[in-house]
Amino acid sequence: VQVGDIAYHVAAVARGARRALKIADLPFGADATPEQAHAAAVRFIQAGAAMVKLEGAGHKLEIIRYLVDREIPVCAHLGLTPQSVLRFGGFKVQGREEAAAAQLRADARAVAGAGAGLLVLEGVPAALAAALTAASPIPTIGIGAGAGCDGQVLVLHDLLGIDTGHRKPRF
């Protein structure tokens, strides 16, 4: 998916959903540098997004700071980050082992400290997600991360029990 494709769809959603918070996801590769991320984010904001989402921490902290310093609200995404699924060896819950949980705790503190205004936790054990939420100065949204987050993403196909050929989620 290209930046232009997302900007087009953000504009369509913005026309139909005027009061909803619209968050546009930076596609794979669009956040390779702070400048590239900024260029994409500006397009999304101009199209009607209120915030941009990017996956991960580490080197992404510089990008979060860069965007926030330029008045672009950022949503960070930790845990099972779909753009990194090949590195994870598939769609697997993240943070089960103590070392991985400690890294998620550090990453959650770091993205909030860098200026992210919202944190998505995906595929994280429920107890860890609840602990991250309790310690977080910013709201958390869970995707398959238990009921302890501040809000939830529910995928329509999961909610309706529509099988797309993949293993059904346990939540």
Ranges and model annotations:
Residues V1-F171:
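Alpha/beta enzyme core
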